[in-house]
């Protein structure tokens, strides 16, 4: 643990538009967030891998400590980091592997909640999505399907999602 200013980790709860249940997400706010009352911040929505949950990037990945150090060394500007459980199953759905309708969960649940509660810089240029393993597949599919919402996509140890007829991957990657 380096002697640098540290941000905060906050657990938030909102009602899922997919399941109707209360859902938790974790939000990293950079050092000084609570004192910089007029500053707005870009957001990275960071997705976990299969078998993990919204706490994986904090407890295993130490994403908050990595950001603290990058910000202190001026290698990264202060951002908000949102880590959400990448699943959205209805009570009668089989949660064996696929994450349910997580796309709707993120786009119509988590993002509006975060943008209402936190000082988020407006527009797609200030919103990114990234993930590991299953989270990378989700990030790629959601990011490519909503290029009006996300300016950057990070894919870590993942692949292309299952074929979706609305995506012509070759054309999308060329754009």
Model-derived segments and their meaning:
Residues 1-175:
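Non-catalytic cap/lid and distal C-terminal segments of serine-dependent acyl enzymes
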């Amino acid at each position: 643990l380096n002697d640098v200013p540290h941000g905060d980790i906050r657990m938030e709860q909102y009602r899922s538009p997919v399941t109707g249940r209360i859902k938790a997400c974790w939000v990293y706010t950079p050092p000084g967030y609570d004192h910089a009352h007029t500053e707005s911040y870009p957001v990275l929505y960071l997705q976990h891998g299969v078998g993990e949950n919204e706490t994986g990037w904090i407890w295993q990945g130490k994403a908050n400590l990595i950001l603290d150090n990058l910000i202190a060394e001026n290698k990264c500007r202060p951002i908000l980091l949102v880590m959400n459980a990448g699943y959205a199953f209805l009570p009668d759905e089989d949660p064996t592997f696929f994450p349910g309708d997580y796309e709707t969960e993120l786009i119509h649940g988590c993002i509006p909640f975060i943008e209402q509660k936190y000082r988020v810089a407006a527009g797609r240029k200030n919103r990114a999505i990234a993930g590991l393993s299953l989270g990378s597949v989700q990030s790629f599919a959601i990011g490519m399907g909503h290029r009006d919402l996300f300016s950057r996509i990070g894919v870590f140890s993942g692949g292309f999602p299952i074929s979706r007829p609305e995506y012509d991957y070759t054309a999308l990657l060329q754009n």
